[in-house]
Amino acid sequence: SGTMVSGIAKVDETTEWAVKLFDLNQEALTKSKKALETTLSKLVEKEKINDIEKSRIQNNISYVSNLQDLSNSDLVIEAIVENLEVKRKLFSELENYVSPETILASNTSSLSIASIAASCQKPERVIGIHFFNPAPLMQLVEVIPAIQTSEEVLTTTIKTISDWEKVVAVAKDTPGFIVNRVARPFYSESLRIYDESVADFATIDWALKTIGNFRMGPFELMDMIGHDVNYIVT
């Protein structure tokens, strides 16, 4: 129930889906619940939603710490650490609790969906659904079918994401997919400019935001994403 999970949950719950937010850590669940309350209260203050809508959204989400609580889910979206073996283990375990029709999706930003699917008894139900941070605000969502993914699962996933009023880009199951593949030079060339003492961090960020019209500079973005995650993606 970290940043991405909470963000994805906010997308789901505002579309009248019943949402279950899972984490083994009860403290993390409590933190997510408080963050949602803060976000919704701000939306009420700005008159984006009213108190009735706030209550409806809050009632749509439950916080669980046992995988068996996900048993009646139509769609499960995983957003844990970017480690292939950890994800494979989770997906394999999930199959013990969910129905055969449940779609299992990974929010991975770069790992092979086919490799994750290979850990499952029903690999055809596995697909990539890659949101961008912050998920409630970013419109683009990459949908990545593995070689094993069924056409029905792909079609259902595209419809679901579209119903959430997001823009779907279907990507090939290749490292980095679309956006993170394109972003590699954005980071690497910025690092090279710094390494060659052409400009410092702040100047590079300033130039790309002011002249290039990027919302965030490369170093600001790397700090936000986390260098550990960026390294794995690269």
Which sequence ranges carry the predicted segments?
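N-terminal glycine-rich phosphate-binding loop for ADP-containing cofactors
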Residues: 1-234
